[in-house]
Amino acid sequence: MGFWAKSLRIFKCLCDHGTLSIRQLAQRTDVAKSSVHRLKQAMERRDIHPESWVWETEVGHQWLLRLIVATLYTFGLKRGVGLDTMSEFFTRLRLARQVGGSPSALRQVMQVLETALLETAGRWEKDGVAAGEVREIIGAVDETFLEQMILVFQDVRTGYIVQEEGADDRTYTTWKAVVEARLTALGAEVWYLVSDRAKALIQLAEQGLECLSMPDFFHCMHDLVKSYALTIGQRVRQAQHELTKAQETLARRHAPHSLDGSEREARAIVEARQGEVTRWEEVRTAYRDHLATLSLTLHPFRIADSAPQTSAQVANQLQATLEAITALAQRQQLPARYDAMTKVRKQVPALAALVDLWWQGVHQDVEPCVLSPRWRQWVDECLLPMVYWGHQVTRTRCRRRKATMQAAWAATRAAFDQHAITQRLTPDVLAEWQAWALQRTKAFQRTSSAVEGRNGYLSQMHHNQRGLPRRRYKVWTIVHNFDCRAADGTTPASRFFQRTFPDLFEAVLSQIEDLPQPRRRKHQVALTH
């Protein structure tokens, strides 16, 4: 029986029977007289605040345990708050006499918490793998640099971090060894891999995993923006500055009842400067329209009529838009960005290849159903575009592109509702079809933004805690996979393994039985801690 269990038994006995001698307490609680004496003295030392008696009860002690562990878990593990800060927090709550709240004592609890997390997540992952279903991963791979280089491999569709592993290098051999070992343990396969086009990552996809190497579309767009957006923006600001100067000159030369030559000249200059502003604003608008066209082109459906499109059609449209950007830059005599444009053009075939691969997955799913041409037309031209655009609307922040997608969704929704097959299906069957369509929609991933965001989170946490033991990295992975909840309440692990898991915090809380004992120190020292 531990320290706190004996204390709770003694306090309950005192509450039930009133004042008792040490001998009587020992007899009723089955605790040695010497222990009863020490524990009773400890209770008296803790009883210095009006609420102190609450923590001596079983309910109060359980709540105190939850408070300590929840603080360490939420603020320490998930937010990177230091132990010194949390120790001060517990002191402000007047808990220094109730429980060990020093940084060293909290560190012990944190270590127990980390061990419980590692063991719990290990069991749950084995349970998920034991289901025996071969999982199809849409991988995003990248590396981040903390105290050592960390290789990050994430399933983009579910958000599940497949692997976060420290490594000395990022060569193809290292990546292949790390990824293949993890895939074997999970019984999973990679459908395609999204990356920043590092040579080792391209080789990993095409040779190691034998899948499509998908360029990160965000990186492509970023390369285009770096090429011309800054230059065009500078021309707009320069033209606006010249217009402001011309207007100020005109205001100084303006006379109430005269129109001499100098004022006419100033007005002409203002009109010319206004023309330059209009010209460069139109150039900027045209450039942004081209960028929006690129973004709206790389989809399984045409944005204009939501008709299914192929990789060849997408590639032609992307190349045509890139040529339009180049022509715009040449007409406006902007600095040539040959290397950047060539880099983007070379990635167009791999970008467009995702469209045919996505349709291949769709056809593999519906092939066992042996659909008639009319049913296939309903799936390809009504159901899938309706669900796809509806999902993309929720993910798009740009107001212009969102409005365009909303218009496409509204049109497909109307066609879907009016179709004879839609009207004939029961609500349950229709819901199953829509759930399947949503899963296929989520399989179209153009960027590795999730893994980039993960890298930023790791860097921020590492900065907050001024470096961490390597063991903490695995704990962060577990917290992300099993306790990072989406709006619908699901976690990456529940989406990846397609099953529910208990609440991670409650699971580890049940494994922590005792809290550290408070220090025996003078009252004044405790107050000034």
Q: Where on the chain are the PLM-derived regions?
A:
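RNase H-like polynucleotidyl transferase catalytic core
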Residues: L212-Y228, A431-F444
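RNase H-like nuclease fold core
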Residues: S52-V194, A198-F217, L224-L328
